[in-house]
Design a protein with these regions (language model features):
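Acidic, histidine-bearing metal-coordination/catalytic regions of metal-dependent phosphoesterases
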Residues: 1-84, 99, 103, 107-136, ...
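A short, conserved beta-strand element in the Rossmann-like catalytic core
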Residues: 92-93
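Short, intrinsically disordered, charge-balanced linker/junction segments flanking boundaries
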Residues: 302-317
């Protein structure tokens, strides 16, 4: 049961280039470095400052509690003296779907957002941070759902189980090759369908200056977009680098040798074993009464196991 898959590295790179209009003539003419930014909060030159680091924040609400809300509450204790938050990836589980941004990110971290007192009114692609949360892409932010599972319908038990599994945290859209993340956090320049609008935007928001030229000016509470899927900035005399490691390491193919054949057969066997494990878990899950607290808690455990099994299958493939 292949519920998730990871797009090819060349696809990830090309799609992200299109979204930020990489090397567009209007950008090149202005000498803009699309991999740099400055944080304009009036304090960026101070030598003493603190920041927080989080990651893997994308889990959803579980029985009677929301893990990310509990994390956010702890972070709020340090927010007054904190300049920004670094996010190390996996913003949304399991496949970076836009439909989970309200419940898994906007609502639990609402105090960090402008207008956070009414999180239901904040669109995932229109977030502005009062306290910067500077993100990077995790593998889950690139994952997708096969098209056949978006269109398939039917009354069979197998399909009902699959639909219930989708209801966990997979959704029906996937990340669309990282598009949801890009619209949520990046300066999505592809949205401008007229060059004069693009140039006006560049002249307004790309006024920062670094040794490499002009760059995006990140202004908390006003304009809080990131320039690219990877970027750098300097704060308090320290250089920070955010990388997209999803596009760096492409595993070598298994060689066409006797040893390679053994390895390939072992992986196929492991994949078949995972299919059996998934089916057994779904059968167990189908017997649970989610109105029962003990069963609801057990469902959380089964959901986590299913997610891990799907990640292993993605790695195998």
């Amino acid at each position: 049961m292949d519920l998730i898959f990871d797009p090819a590295i060349p696809v990830k790179i090309e799609k992200m280039k299109q979204r930020v209009q990489w090397k567009h003539q209007s950008i090149v003419q202005r000498g803009i470095d699309q991999t740099s930014m400055v944080i304009d909060d009036g304090k960026e030159d101070s030598e003493e400052f603190s920041f927080m680091v989080i990651g893997d924040s994308g889990t959803t609400c579980q029985y009677e509690h929301h893990p990310q809300r509990e994390v956010a509450k702890l972070m709020l204790q340090h927010r007054p003296e904190c300049r920004f938050v670094l996010h190390t990836g996996d913003v949304i589980y399991t496949v970076g779907s836009r439909e989970y941004y309200p419940s898994n990110f906007i609502k639990p971290y609402r105090e960090f957002l402008k207008g956070g007192e009414n999180p239901q009114n904040i669109a995932y692609d229109n977030m502005v941070f009062d306290t910067p949360i500077l993100t990077t892409l995790g593998n889950h932010d690139y994952y997708d759902v096969p098209l056949k599972y978006r269109a398939i319908t039917g009354p069979t038990l197998k399909l009902r189980r699959m639909f219930r599994y989708h209801d966990f945290e997979i959704g029906w859209f996937g990340s669309e090759q990282g598009d949801a993340y890009a619209k949520a956090f990046l300066d999505y320049l592809a949205r401008f369908n007229q060059q004069e609008k693009l140039e006006s935007h560049l002249d307004e928001h790309y006024t920062g200056k670094t040794d490499s030229g002009r760059c995006l000016r990140y202004e908390p509470g006003h304009f809080t977009r990131l320039p690219n899927r990877y970027y750098t900035f300097r704060y308090g005399g320290i250089d920070f680098f955010a990388l997209d490691s999803n596009t760096i390491n492409d595993p070598s193919p298994i060689p066409a040798t006797p040893q390679g054949d053994i390895r390939r057969k072992a992986l196929i066997q492991r994949r078949d074993e995972i299919d059996i494990e998934e089916q057994q878990i779904l059968e167990e899950y189908d017997k649970l009464n989610l109105d029962n607290p003990k069963d609801a808690e057990k469902s959380d455990t089964l959901e986590a196991i299913l997610s891990q099994l799907n990640e292993i299958k993605v790695d195998i493939e």
